Amino acid sequence: MDTALPWFKDAFPIYLAPMAGVTDKVFRQICKGYGADVLVTEFVSAEGVFRRNERTREYLDFDACERPIGVQLFGADGTHMAEAAKQVVDWVAPDFIDLNFGCPVNKVVAKNGGSALLKDCPTLTSVAKAVVDAVAPLPVTAKIRIGWDADSVNAVRVAEILERCGIAALAVHGRTRAQGYSGEADWRVIGDVAQAVTIPVIGNGDLFSPQEVMRRRAEPKIAGVMIGRAAMSAPWIFRQIKHYLATGELSPAPELSERWDAIIEHCRRHAENWGDEEQAIRAMRARLMAYSKNFPEAKALRKKFQHVATLADVERIAEEHLATAATMSDFVGQAFLPATA
């Protein structure tokens, strides 16, 4: 496949999806450690960059160990988007710029950003072309949904437009904007997009297991996949996927102790980055709720996570949870021991 993005050459890259409030620098690096091939920042307001807003600029921060990494921009003004993209390239030199044409959130759509541009192809075209021209030869990619709603599924047309604009690769989430994250992702439409264009197409939606990724890799012309919500509760899914694609064998989830080590490290680094431990740990509560999924005694854990305010709180909960799990394991083991005379 002829592409300006080298990670597609003779490979099937696994992307970490950009998720607002989730894929900050700390979490991206955790996922990279577990095997994510390509990272993308949380979406960044092009208007904020254009106006040199310092808070916006914080979202652009990444470390060299995260490469290859792209900065994702959203906006609807082609001139401002182009200038913002040039500023981003000058400031942080990402490996690519990514354009958000898929976000379903009301506050983004209300400003004609994100998935709103799926029903405004002239503006989408002007934005894509302006950014591609502004940062050339740096590659520009894009992420879309399959359409605005069930009556306007136009992903193939949008993909063809974006390819003509010079977009180097396209991630397609298999839901409409109206669906949000409900219902099932329509991989038939993702496949239609992949057949319609010559640029790499990355499939996204309902990839919660290595088996599902293997299934999608086998579909014609799908060049890679993007993992989103599954990584929020299990960043080690990247390691499991890589193992399964390489060997055809399923590897178990990490031991409970390793999962807790990852959570505590995430909290510790998040607190260091914020410089205010209590504020940082309180901000981590929603992330801890996601981590608790598929943990033993998950409901009880979630109740405890609602009140954490320090790293010591998290460490205490981990210690108690591991002790309880060990006791239960010993009890189960004793229950199945053979009777003795």
Residue ranges and their predicted role:
Residues 1-10, 19-95:
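Glycine-rich, positively charged N-terminal anion/phosphate-binding segment
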Residues 39-40, 70-72, 98, 141, ...:
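Conserved beta-strand positions in the central sheet of alpha/beta enzyme cores
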Residues 82-113, 121-199:
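Alpha/beta enzyme core
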Residues 120-127, 262-263, 284:
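Hydrophobic alpha-helical membrane-association signature
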